[in-house]
A protein has these predicted regions:
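Short loop/turn motifs that connect adjacent beta-strands in outer-membrane beta-barrel proteins
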Residues: 24-27, 136-137, 153-160, 186, ...
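Periplasmic-side early beta-strands and strand-to-turn transitions of outer-membrane beta-barrels
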Residues: 147-149, 155-159, 163, 174-257
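Acidic, small-polar-rich N-terminal luminal/periplasmic segments of exported/outer-membrane proteins
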Residues: 22-155
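Membrane-embedded beta-strand positions in outer-membrane beta-barrel channels/transporters
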Residues: 32, 83, 112, 125, ...
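Cleavable N-terminal targeting peptides that direct proteins into the secretory/outer-membrane pathway or into
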Residues: 1-25
Length: 306
């Protein structure tokens, strides 16, 4: 009886083996997925180099760059001017600074969040502070803080630095960036310019998504270093832009920002007073939204663009 049972089950085992082999041969290989992240050395903060490519295309504004940070998300409106959130919290609960100046939008509906006026490539470092465990990032800190930093250049001898990039992509994406710096022992001059634009996005069915944008930015900084421990700088920054929004029946036809600041630093004053820093600045934002300059209107059954 035992021998009969053994030979009766043997064909069934061959059948299962053949079926398993056929399933193994029909395995479908998927395209590889590239995940880019930032190496963390401090659990409470993350530092980014905005000039390093962290995503397939250079960041168009500050929110676009912050997407590469863990727990950071962005509310998309179109191709630009997204609203950043950290751990689900944004708005006034996420403080934004650029060159040690707080930036605020001009629209109560968050059509122009502070990051909409920031061009990441014009800065040297981005520091993201997680949570409210700090007293140096302003009041009302709940979600965290983001600082876009320009570092002080050091010139022991007279020298000149040049940096630039050009990016071309689909949907009429055009990016250009130029940064120049010249200086010596007693001072330096730095200037940067950037231009970002893209047309409307098309989905897989070739449907046009209202999401075009264009941005321009210029910065000029003059530094004076009469001694090794003294620094006096003056900075002026100008940005202009417009953005089409797909999430509402209104577009941002004007994103203008003019900002300037003066900074004085004196180090190694006494053994018990190591550094004195004075800073004064002003920022002016002009934001206009409308329903006609960047989109088609339906009038009497006809598509009319004003």
């Amino acid at each position: 009886m035992h021998n009969k049972s053994y030979f009766a089950l043997l064909p069934l085992s061959f059948f299962i083996s053949n079926a398993f082999a056929e399933d193994m041969q029909s395995v479908t290989l998927l395209d590889p997925i590239v995940v880019t992240g930032v190496t963390q050395t401090n659990t409470n903060s993350v530092k980014l180099n905005p000039k390093t490519t962290l995503q397939p295309l250079p960041a168009g504004d500050g929110a676009d760059l912050l997407q590469s940070v863990a727990n950071m998300s962005v509310i998309r409106k179109g191709g630009s001017s997204g609203d950043p959130l950290f751990r689900g919290l944004g708005g006034s609960r996420l403080n934004i600074q650029a060159d040690d100046q707080f930036i605020y939008g001009g629209c109560s509906n968050r059509m122009d969040p502070p990051t909409a006026y920031i061009f990441p490539s014009a800065y040297d470092e981005v520091v993201v502070t997680k949570g409210p465990q700090t007293v140096t990032e302003g009041s009302g800190l709940v979600a965290g803080a983001v600082r876009f930093v320009r570092k002080e250049p050091e010139f022991d001898t007279q020298n000149t630095y040049l940096n630039g990039s050009v990016t071309l992509g689909g949907n009429k994406r055009r990016d250009a960036y130029f940064d120049a710096m010249a200086g010596g022992k007693y001072g330096y001059l730095r200037t940067s310019m950037s231009h970002n634009e893209a047309g409307n996005y098309k989905d897989g069915d070739s449907n046009r998504v209202h999401s075009s944008f264009e941005r321009r930015n210029q910065m000029l900084q003059l530094g004076f270093t009469p001694t090794e421990n003294t620094l006096l700088t003056g900075t002026y920054e100008r940005s202009r832009g417009e953005a089409a929004y797909a999430d509402r029946m209104m577009d941002g036809s004007k994103f203008d920002r003019d900002a300037w600041n003066v900074r004085f630093v004196q180090r190694n004053i006494t053994p018990w007073f190591t550094e004195l820093e004075l800073r004064y600045g002003q920022s002016k934002i002009d934001h206009v939204m409308d329903t006609y300059s960047m989109r088609y209107l339906s009038m009497m059954g006809n598509q009319v663009k004003k």
